[in-house]
Amino acid sequence: MPTVGSLVYIMVELAIALLAILGNMLVCWAVWLNSNLQNVTNYFVVSLAAADIAVGVLAIPFAITISTGFCAACHGCLFIACFVLVLTQSSIFSLLAIAIDRYIAIRIPLRYNGLVTGTRAKGVIAVCWVLSFAIGLTPMLGWNNCHHWGEGENQSQGCGEGQVACLFEDVVPMNYMVYYNFFACVLVPLLLMLGVYLRIFLAARRQLKQMETQPLPGERARSTLQKEVHAAKSLAIIVGLFALCWLPLHIINCFTFFCPECPHAPLWLMYPAIILSHFNSVVNPFIYAYRIREFRHTFHKIIRSHILRRQEPFKAGGTSARALAAHGSDAEQVSLRLNGHPSGVCPNGSAPHPERRPNGYALGLVSRASARESPGDTGLPDVELLSHELHGASPESPGLEGPLAQDGAGVS
C-alpha cells in the first residue's frame, strides 16, 4: 500500500511531467512558426526541448514506476533506470553546443556564418544524441548489478524466478553513477560550459571597453554586442539552473558511494532531490519567455491565436509574431533583417534559408533599430550605416564594410 509520501511524490511528478510537455512543445511550436527564431542556435534549443519533452513523456513515468519496486526482469528494469540518464546526457550536450555556438558568435563573428551552418548543427545534434544513448545505456553492456541477482538474492524481495524488485540502486551500480555518469559526463561538461561563458563575458567586456574610445557611430556596434551578451546571459542562466537542479541528487549519490557505513538518505530527502532534477525540464520555457523578446511575443501569439482561438493567425516560416502583433495585416508585416529585406522574403521573392541568417539573430533578439526601419523600404541597406554599426564588433576585424560586415553582425 503506497504511503502518503509516495502518493504526494507521484502527484508532483505527474504535474511536472504535464508542465514539461506543454512548455517545451510551446518552444518547438514557436520555432516552427516564427522564421525569426529559425537559426542555428535555436536548433540546439529545440534539441534541448525535445529531451525535456521526453522527460515528461517517458522518464517521469519510468521514475514513478521504478519507485514502486515492482517485480521485473533485471535487464528490463535496468533499461527503465538508464533511460533518464540518456535524456540528462542529451540535455548536457545541447547546453554545451549552445555555449560553443555563442562563443563563436561573440569571439569571431565574421567567421560565424562560415563555421556554424544549419547542416553542421544538425550533424552535431545527431552525434550528441548517439553519444547520449551510448553513455546512458552503458550499464546494459555489463556494468550493472544483474549478476548479483542471479545468485538467489531476489527471493527475499518476494519476486519470482528470474525477476528482481525493480529499484534504481539495486540494478545500477553506484560506482557507475559517481565516477562515470557524474564526474566524467556531467561535472566535466558543466565546468567546460563555465569556462566558455566566462571567456564570452571577458571577450565582450574587452570589446565594449574598446568601443568606448570610438566616435558616436560606434554606439550601434556597442548595442549589437550588448544584445549578444544578453543572449549569452540568458543561456548561462539555463546552465546554472541545470546545475542547481541536478547537483543535489548527484551529491546524495556521492555520499552513498563514498560513505557506505553512513545511513542511506531517507525518502523525505530522496524524493525532493528527484523531483528537483525533473523540474529542470519545466524551467527553460519560462527563461525564454522572460529573457528573450522574440520567444515571448511568439508564445503570446500562439496562445491567443491557436489556444484561445482569437483570429490572429500568422504564417509558419514567414513573418514574425512580433511583426504581426505590431501591424495586424499581412501586407504590412515587415520585421526587417540586417539584409534590408522584409522577413520571409529574399530579393528574388523566394523564402529565406534559415542557416543563412546573420549570427546576430541567435535566439531571436531583434535589434530595435532594424525593427523601426520603414516598412516600404525594401531596397538595399545603407552600406555606410552597416559599416558604422558593425565597426568595432570584433577586435580582430576593425573597419570592415558592406557585405563582409553583414556576416559578422552581432545582434542577439
Swiss-Prot record:
<feature type="glycosylation site" description="N-linked (GlcNAc...) asparagine">
    <location>
        <position position="154"/>
    </location>
</feature>
<feature type="transmembrane region" description="Helical; Name=7">
    <location>
        <begin position="267"/>
        <end position="290"/>
    </location>
</feature>
<feature type="binding site">
    <location>
        <position position="169"/>
    </location>
    <ligand>
        <name>adenosine</name>
    </ligand>
</feature>
<keyword id="KW-0675">Receptor</keyword>
<feature type="transmembrane region" description="Helical; Name=4">
    <location>
        <begin position="121"/>
        <end position="143"/>
    </location>
</feature>
<comment type="similarity">
    <text>Belongs to the G-protein coupled receptor 1 family.</text>
</comment>
<dbReference type="InterPro" id="IPR000276">
    <property type="entry name" value="GPCR_Rhodpsn"/>
</dbReference>
<comment type="function">
    <text>Receptor for adenosine. The activity of this receptor is mediated by G proteins which activate adenylyl cyclase.</text>
</comment>
<dbReference type="GO" id="GO:0001609">
    <property type="term" value="F:G protein-coupled adenosine receptor activity"/>
</dbReference>
<comment type="subunit">
    <text>Interacts (via cytoplasmic C-terminal domain) with USP4; the interaction is direct. May interact with DRD4. Interacts with NECAB2. Interacts (via cytoplasmic C-terminal domain) with GAS2L2; interaction enhances receptor-mediated adenylyl cyclase activity.</text>
</comment>
<dbReference type="GO" id="GO:0050728">
    <property type="term" value="P:negative regulation of inflammatory response"/>
</dbReference>
<keyword id="KW-0807">Transducer</keyword>
<feature type="disulfide bond">
    <location>
        <begin position="71"/>
        <end position="159"/>
    </location>
</feature>
<dbReference type="InterPro" id="IPR001513">
    <property type="entry name" value="Adeno_A2A_rcpt"/>
</dbReference>
<feature type="topological domain" description="Cytoplasmic">
    <location>
        <begin position="101"/>
        <end position="120"/>
    </location>
</feature>
<dbReference type="GO" id="GO:0007189">
    <property type="term" value="P:adenylate cyclase-activating G protein-coupled receptor signaling pathway"/>
</dbReference>
<feature type="transmembrane region" description="Helical; Name=6">
    <location>
        <begin position="235"/>
        <end position="258"/>
    </location>
</feature>
<dbReference type="GO" id="GO:0008289">
    <property type="term" value="F:lipid binding"/>
</dbReference>
<feature type="binding site">
    <location>
        <position position="277"/>
    </location>
    <ligand>
        <name>adenosine</name>
    </ligand>
</feature>
<feature type="topological domain" description="Extracellular">
    <location>
        <begin position="1"/>
        <end position="7"/>
    </location>
</feature>
<dbReference type="GO" id="GO:0019899">
    <property type="term" value="F:enzyme binding"/>
</dbReference>
<feature type="disulfide bond">
    <location>
        <begin position="259"/>
        <end position="262"/>
    </location>
</feature>
<feature type="topological domain" description="Cytoplasmic">
    <location>
        <begin position="291"/>
        <end position="412"/>
    </location>
</feature>
<dbReference type="GO" id="GO:0046636">
    <property type="term" value="P:negative regulation of alpha-beta T cell activation"/>
</dbReference>
<dbReference type="GO" id="GO:0060080">
    <property type="term" value="P:inhibitory postsynaptic potential"/>
</dbReference>
<dbReference type="GO" id="GO:0097190">
    <property type="term" value="P:apoptotic signaling pathway"/>
</dbReference>
<feature type="binding site">
    <location>
        <position position="253"/>
    </location>
    <ligand>
        <name>adenosine</name>
    </ligand>
</feature>
<feature type="region of interest" description="Disordered">
    <location>
        <begin position="368"/>
        <end position="412"/>
    </location>
</feature>
<keyword id="KW-0812">Transmembrane</keyword>
<keyword id="KW-0832">Ubl conjugation</keyword>
<feature type="topological domain" description="Extracellular">
    <location>
        <begin position="144"/>
        <end position="173"/>
    </location>
</feature>
<feature type="transmembrane region" description="Helical; Name=3">
    <location>
        <begin position="78"/>
        <end position="100"/>
    </location>
</feature>
<keyword id="KW-0472">Membrane</keyword>
<dbReference type="GO" id="GO:0005886">
    <property type="term" value="C:plasma membrane"/>
</dbReference>
<feature type="transmembrane region" description="Helical; Name=2">
    <location>
        <begin position="43"/>
        <end position="66"/>
    </location>
</feature>
<feature type="binding site">
    <location>
        <position position="278"/>
    </location>
    <ligand>
        <name>adenosine</name>
    </ligand>
</feature>
<dbReference type="GO" id="GO:0098794">
    <property type="term" value="C:postsynapse"/>
</dbReference>
<feature type="topological domain" description="Cytoplasmic">
    <location>
        <begin position="199"/>
        <end position="234"/>
    </location>
</feature>
<feature type="topological domain" description="Extracellular">
    <location>
        <begin position="67"/>
        <end position="77"/>
    </location>
</feature>
<protein>
    <recommendedName>
        <fullName>Adenosine receptor A2a</fullName>
    </recommendedName>
</protein>
<dbReference type="GO" id="GO:0007626">
    <property type="term" value="P:locomotory behavior"/>
</dbReference>
<keyword id="KW-1133">Transmembrane helix</keyword>
